[in-house]
Amino acid sequence: MKNICVVTATRSEYGLLRWIIDILSKDKDVNLQIVATGSHLSKEFGMTYHFIEHDGYTIDAKIDMELHTEDLYSIPRSMGICAEKISYAFRSLKPDMIVILGDRYELLPIVNTALLFNIPIAHISGGDITEGAIDNEVRNAVTMMSSLHFPGTEESAVRLRRMLGMDENIYVVGEPGLDSFLRHQLMTRSELAEQLNLNASKQWMLVTLHSETKESLDYNLQMTENLYNVMIGQKNVQFVVTKANADFGGSQINKYWDAKQDDDVRVVASLGQLRYLSFMSQVECVLGNSSSGIVEAPFLGIPVVNIGNRQKGRHICKNVICCRSEERRVGKECRSRWS
């Protein structure tokens, strides 16, 4: 029996890993181990490790990075704390392989430690491109330290083959987030209205805006304000805003939204995967710069206004309109989508 350790650092990435975890948990030849770190252990970002436990899984190690995102100096400190603590966790758990997904900076101390411990790394969703964030560099660094690669598209696989200089151990598996639509029974509109205190007769919009980590804090706050200025005054529309990731600038964006919350602008730290996908299926439009607008929303055929450069370089489907972050541009594209 092999110890396969799945490491998760964010609410969104756990949602993508959920059904992979489920399959591993049922394999008689696998001893599943789960490590939760990053924003999962942060009060500011919703203590989302509870979603993992609610799904019936045991978390074998909780690595509190003492995560703070108010300034750039706090994040490297948190990464150093994570590296120290994860080394003790790996020494105790003795994983034969770790499984990680994506491009979050929280993964760097994980894969660095695994590399030093000579633990093979399986990386999901390598080979993608996101030009507007440091995620690109993180993703490629993780790729170079990994032994197994599971890209979502053939296009991404081509990039991996070019980067790695080999064809071996690269398997195109599709986008794991789409599995949830096949496995979940989505909630009804009336159930969502009751849980989120919304008016089911109004139009609903889903908003998720993360910081562009290659831009300044002022730029990111201006982008947020530009979107809010477009949202206010819309008649018969309610917006649900899910808070930004634990990137530099994320805390300030979240504080901005908290200050703007009212009956028609609902702000939540996290909806959880089932409510998030269910709500997405009921909205008139998805606004912001989340990867879910690029991957999951097209599966549902929901219109998307993708703002700014965070997702620049990704494959864009026909239902997605990309625009710059200026208020005039955002307003024009949003109104064209919900009119």
Where on the chain are the PLM-derived regions?
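Donor-nucleotide binding loops and adjacent catalytic segments primarily
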Residues: I52, M187-Q282
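Active-site and donor-binding regions of nucleotide-sugar-utilizing enzymes
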Residues: C5-T8, Y14-S25, M65-D167
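A nucleotide-sugar donor-handling region in carbohydrate enzymes
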Residues: L41-K43, M145-N220
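A generic structural motif
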Residues: D27-Q33, T58, K235-Q238
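A donor-sugar binding/catalytic signature common to diverse glycosyltransferases
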Residues: I100-L101, L108, H123, H149, ...
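Short internal beta-strands
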Residues: Q33-G38, H149, F239-A244
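Conserved nucleotide-sugar phosphate-binding/catalytic loop shared by glycosyltransferases and other
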Residues: Q33-I75, K85
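Conserved small/polar residues in nucleotide/adenosyl-binding loops
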Residues: E327-C334
